[in-house]
Design a protein with these regions (language model features):
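Noncatalytic, solvent-exposed loop/strand surfaces
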Residues: 1-234
Length: 234
């Protein structure tokens, strides 16, 4: 998704009953499989559990389109969906934001800012490649919170009402093309592939953050240079 608008298509209605963004500390596999929690959906496979969905779209005639709404800031990421919420992120030289929309209507429910010292530094403006921009990674949700990471290395966690749970900086990544890896989750762990620099510099890491607090649980060196893939759980 670049900038401008988000489109949403019609799908069969599922009754989620009492399942909501509260309850257990992390979602069950059944919850994950009937939502779209991160980049390329459940397990990063690009496979949806839904059937009888539109296979044709036309922005001019509205064929296959339920609604369309503006996105406040540009981002190269993809939308994620959890029941009645759609999440996106965006950014420009003036700020980094996370957005939440109503699945049924496309109404913007909230937008929240992250604080980035690196972005707002007066000494040297933060520069990004046009192909990646400030918000290339797709956000991740566990059905209780939503997590977003940006080109600056800043990570923000918000609950479903838009309250900031925590914010953390991993430092500006040394990545010539810009940071674009989307996070994934295992139970309460937010897994971040943070590749940067050259292989000889040994700057690249796989990092696990506690989804509740943002604290680093563990990190493992990766013998690679800067790259742009995203981790998946198998």
């Amino acid at each position: 998704l670049g900038s401008g608008a988000i489109f949403f298509t019609i799908r069969p209605l599922i009754d989620f009953g009492a399942v909501g963004p509260v309850g257990t500390s992390w979602p069950s596999m059944e919850e994950i499989e009937r939502n779209w929690p991160g980049f390329r959906g459940p397990g990063g496979l690009g496979i949806s559990a839904y059937t009888n969905v539109p296979v044709k779209w036309n922005g001019k005639t509205a064929e296959g389109i339920l609604w369309k709404t503006e996105v406040p800031l540009p981002g190269k990421n993809s939308p994620v969906v959890w029941e009645d919420r759609v999440f996106l992120s965006g950014g420009d030289p003036n700020g980094l934001q996370v957005f939440c929309y109503d699945t049924a209507s496309g109404k913007l429910l909230w937008k929240k800012d992250l604080t980035s010292a690196d972005l707002k530094s007066e000494e040297e403006p933060f520069e990004v490649m046009e192909d990646t921009g400030f918000a290339a990674p797709t956000v991740m949700t566990d059905g209780r919170r939503v997590y977003a990471i940006f080109a600056t290395g800043d990570i923000g966690c918000f609950d479903f009402e838009g309250n900031k749970v925590w914010e953390k900086s991993l430092g500006v990544p040394d990545n010539v093309y810009g940071y674009a890896s989307s996070p994934t989750m295992y139970r309460n762990l937010l897994l971040i592939q943070y590749d940067q620099g050259s292989a000889e510099e040994e700057k690249s890491n796989l990092i696990a953050l506690d989804g509740f607090s943002g604290q680093i649980v563990w990190q493992t060196k990766r013998p690679v240079s800067n790259s742009w893939s995203s981790p998946i759980m198998v």
